[in-house]
From Swiss-Prot:
Gene: bsk
Disruption phenotype: RNAi-mediated knockdown results in reduced levels of DIP2.
UniProt: ATP binding residues: G31, S32, G33, A34, Q35, G36, K53
Name recorded for this polypeptide: Stress-activated protein kinase JNK
Entry text on domains: The TXY motif contains the threonine and tyrosine residues whose phosphorylation activates the MAP kinases.
Length: 372
């Protein structure tokens, strides 16, 4: 590396110091979460606006360190227009002993889906957002990554309605048990099979898309449970108690609870999502699109995953297929994700060394690409 590439400067962002490359200027905070603080900045080399995420105390414990490693590996792996791209990664520390900070540089978007949900979306915008969501999910699935935790706060959009998925969901080892309380993170969008601690397949993510679509139409969360039990109750009150064949697939203790709940017949999708909630242009085309949207919801929001629509089927549904582009839907699959990362056990120091090697490798790769 040249001396210029070693130059860093420090900016105070709230109560956090950002020590970043001198190529990035005009920092301003745009968000913070459990995994880090994000600032918008301007990249003077590429001459584009970017988002810089400082991972929050990545070596505080084994869980944080493992999560940081997984996120970094996945961001390097995937490459799709509907998944946030990694533009750069760096650390201001120059050796393993001092290493403590990881910065990820990503594309800058305008808003997350929470803000978009508050707007009155017409059918074209809504179906286009859903189409892009499904394309991104299909790409993750092609790498063997099943998300399980899609939610509006982790989906970002630009003013031109382009959409990107911002994270990679739950690690395969992140099981959830039915009686877990209280809620630490938002679980409103998690599928019944995740809430109930069952096995799951790729269409677990379709449930989340259905919840997000329903929220776009209603303007409010569909199943705002305070814990897993309340979540389950909210689902069956609206959609009805599932069939005995579904109950048979539950673990005995969970089945015992679920079978002893009052039985609900649920409501029709015409009642759950009446015409008045949809864009109304008072024409035949608008009514047909509302009917198509309801039909898609009725196939996504199915408690039994064996009866739920697949990602491929959803992409071909009448409400979505107007946007269908084979190059976007069937983009080249990334290398399969090595799930042994999720199973691996290391000390914090070992994870730290692995992450340091990844960051150094990434910095070297970027430098070589720039100097060719």
């Amino acid at each position: 590396m040249t001396t210029a590439q070693h130059q860093h400067y420090t900016v105070e962002v709230g109560d956090t110091n950002f020590t970043i490359h001198s190529r990035y200027i005009n920092l301003r905070p745009i968000g913070s979460g459990a995994q880090g603080i994000v600032c918008a900045a301007y990249d003077t080399i590429t001459q584009q606006n970017v988002a810089i995420k400082k991972l929050s105390r990545p070596f505080q414990n084994v869980t944080h360190a493992k999560r940081a490693y997984r996120e970094f590996k996945l961001m390097k792996l995937v490459n799709h227009k509907n998944i946030i791209g990694l533009l750069n990664a760096f650390t201001p520390q120059r050796n393993l002993e001092e290493f403590q900070d990881v910065y990820l540089v990503m594309e800058l978007m305008d808003a997350n889906l929470c803000q978009v949900i508050q707007m009155d979306l017409d059918h074209d915008r809504m179906s286009y957002l859903l189409y892009q969501m499904l394309c991104g999910i299909k790409h993750l699935h092609s790498a063997g990554i099943i998300h399980r935790d899609l939610k509006p706060s982790n989906i970002v959009v630009k003013a031109d309605c382009t959409l990107k998925i911002l994270d990679f969901g739950l690690a395969r080892t992140a099981g959830t048990t039915f009686m877990m309380t209280p809620y630490v993170v938002t679980r409103y969008y998690r599928a019944p099979e995740v809430i109930l601690g069952m096995g799951y397949t790729e269409n677990v993510d379709i449930w989340s898309v259905g919840c997000i679509m329903g929220e776009m139409i209603r303007g409010g969360v569909l199943f705002p449970g305070t814990d897993h039990i309340d979540q389950w109750n909210k689902i069956i009150e609206q959609l009805g108690t599932p069939s005995p064949s579904f109950m048979q697939r539950l673990q005995p203790t969970v089945r015992n609870y679920v079978e002893n709940r009052p039985r609900y017949t649920g409501y029709s999708f015409d009642r759950l999502f009446p015409d008045g909630l949809f864009p109304n242009d008072n024409n035949q085309n608008s009514r047909r699109k509302a009917s198509d949207a309801r039909n898609l919801l009725s196939k996504m929001l199915v408690i039994d995953p064996e009866q739920r629509i697949s990602v491929d089927e959803a992409l071909k549904h009448e409400y979505i297929n107007v946007w269908y582009d084979a190059e976007e839907v069937d983009a080249p699959a990334p290398e399969p994700y090595d799930h042994s990362v999720d199973e691996r056990e290391h000390t914090v120091e070992q994870w730290k060394e692995l992450i340091y090697e990844e960051v150094m490798d990434y910095e070297a790769h970027n430098t070589n690409n720039r100097t060719r």
